[in-house]
């Protein structure tokens, strides 16, 4: 979750204060109460006494960073990554992984239990806390005065770039590629034209996209192509107009059931492959799919849930707002010989009950909306009268809001599980099953 803070209009009298930390929120921030005001403090754990530097302050709450740990928690740990103090990629490496997960789970479950006390809270869906990211976007910036080039992630709370030679949350092949990229760009003829690099570890190798401004010099194109051949990369370049593939094939990943999902370098895919598979398995299990089911998959993308569902049901219809993704989903269905699947483009923030696909009978529905949630679609969705709705969420705030809406339409929250898709960060995802009463 990205939080945009607006500084308080009047500067505080003191820029630091001492606080005792009472709790931990799901984003890994310590929570303190000082003179009736709630403070959310980075790099602080429960039971600690810390000196806090104020980042911003509102009337009823404020944000700060602990600049000195006066009384440390006995379980506080040293960060695994040497860049952790500066890099904005992770927020929670000082917190033991069990404590991270407990805080995330408690925050989600407390909110939902207030709405549906009878809901069953299932074990968390987890995987390894390190080397799990199969995708990363790296900023690249050349400093003309120093003649130095930086490549990495943004520094915490600034726009500066942390120059990364490795990353402990990236899958190992991606992390191992970082120093080689630094070496490549050190010989670049026009480094000021470099924009960013995207890396994706697909099941058929690493795909790389280089974003640049202006024309790519022939010497740089040759360097880049030779590098891609040497490292066996699928290579793409993007200028101000288009993306061009210079080497390799299209990237894809394969699910446990053999479903092969091909995607383009800029397409959204779940960054944690292991957790993605567990999430799919959980969705299929909770929906209790049978060969008689007709399933509707909303916000379906290129078919990450749709195609595995199709192997167990009578028919599945996938709805996606982006036309290009619909075409890719159709292509994936054809390549996987899934002939009981239909995909349609629809803007789900507009009424859709009159669209022809909505006139079909669906007894089960899956939706995986963006961070803004699905409040705009839930009224029409509930009118379809499905017996089960499975909701995959990447934002606890919109999940709680949408749960309240579903309860108003006589759906009951039966069970929910937290998904630790991004260990050592403040991100929280979940999967929830609703049943018609």
From Swiss-Prot:
GO terms for biological process: rRNA base methylation. Its EC number is 2.1.1.190. [4Fe-4S] cluster binds at residues 81, 87, 90, 167. Keywords: 4Fe-4S, Iron, Iron-sulfur, Metal-binding, Methyltransferase, rRNA processing, S-adenosyl-L-methionine, Transferase. GO terms for molecular function: 4 iron, 4 sulfur cluster binding; iron ion binding; RNA binding; rRNA (uridine-C5-)-methyltransferase activity. The lineage of its organism: Bacteria, Pseudomonadati, Pseudomonadota, Gammaproteobacteria, Pasteurellales. Residues 10-68 form the TRAM domain. It comes from the Bacteria. The keyword Thylakoid does not apply. The active site is at 394 (nucleophile). It catalyses: uridine(1939) in 23S rRNA + S-adenosyl-L-methionine = 5-methyluridine(1939) in 23S rRNA + S-adenosyl-L-homocysteine + H(+). This is 23S rRNA (uracil(1939)-C(5))-methyltransferase RlmD. Catalyzes the formation of 5-methyl-uridine at position 1939 (m5U1939) in 23S rRNA. Gene3D superfamilies: 2.40.50.1070, Nucleic acid-binding proteins, Vaccinia Virus protein VP39. S-adenosyl-L-methionine binds at residues 270, 299, 304, 320, 347, 368. It holds the Pfam family TRAM. Belongs to the class I-like SAM-binding methyltransferase superfamily. RNA M5U methyltransferase family. RlmD subfamily. InterPro entries: 23S_rRNA_MeTrfase_RlmD, MeTrfase_TrmA_AS, NA-bd_OB-fold, SAM-dependent_MTases_sf, TRAM_dom, U5_MeTrfase_fam.
